[in-house]
């Protein structure tokens, strides 16, 4: 069995004392990492966006220090608050618009960059939608998990305003596919 832990929206800044909606973001992230370290044994950790709130290099250094302390494979998806260039400076890699990550012989994680520069809401571009269709076909014998920062299903409150803008296109690709197990 594969165990994946998902962490989302740490909203770290260069200031460890930043509070957002009465939450000290660094302190909260540190407690989450500590809890995982003491209580869980994941095979893989997925951080699904808004790693930083200010996009600063310092925030990504804080993140790197904590996430790497778990000594587990991890993958980071960027969100609307993240800065791709500063993230790349710290992690020395590009964040592809679509990436397929084999988790085992039977499971594949497909991560999508749904960020749109200068926008809070997200979208998938046509090239991504084509790649998604191909990945579903190529991996028809495997279980697929899709992960993106912007949610494709309406939740019924303010967050819907910044969800996936072309959710209908994305959902039409995945809804009737038996090998798509989770989003």
Task: Spell out what each predicted region is.
Residues 5-27, 84-94, 117-126:
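Acidic/histidine-rich helix-loop elements
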Residues 74-84, 181:
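A short, structured active-site edge motif that brings together acidic residues
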Residues 41-43, 72, 141-143, 179:
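Short coil/turn segments at beta-strand junctions that form active-site/ligand-binding loops
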């Amino acid at each position: 069995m594969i165990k994946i832990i998902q962490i989302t929206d740490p909203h770290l800044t260069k200031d460890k004392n930043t509070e957002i909606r009465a939450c000290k973001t660094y302190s909260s992230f540190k407690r989450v990492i500590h809890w995982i370290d003491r209580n869980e044994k994941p095979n893989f950790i997925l951080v699904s966006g808004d790693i930083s709130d200010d996009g600063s290099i310092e925030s990504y250094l804080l993140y790197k220090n904590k996430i790497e302390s778990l000594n587990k494979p991890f993958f980071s998806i960027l969100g609307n608050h993240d800065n791709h260039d500063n993230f790349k400076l710290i992690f020395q890699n590009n964040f592809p618009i679509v990436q397929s990550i084999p988790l085992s012989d039977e499971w594949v994680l497909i991560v999508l960059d749904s960020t749109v520069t200068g926008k809070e809401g997200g979208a998938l571009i046509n090239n991504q939608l084509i790649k998604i269709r191909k990945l579903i076909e190529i991996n028809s014998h495997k279980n697929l998990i899709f992960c993106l920062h912007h949610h494709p299903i309406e939740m019924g409150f303010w967050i819907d305003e910044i969800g996936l803008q072309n959710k209908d296109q994305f959902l039409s690709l995945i809804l009737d596919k038996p090998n798509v197990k989770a989003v």
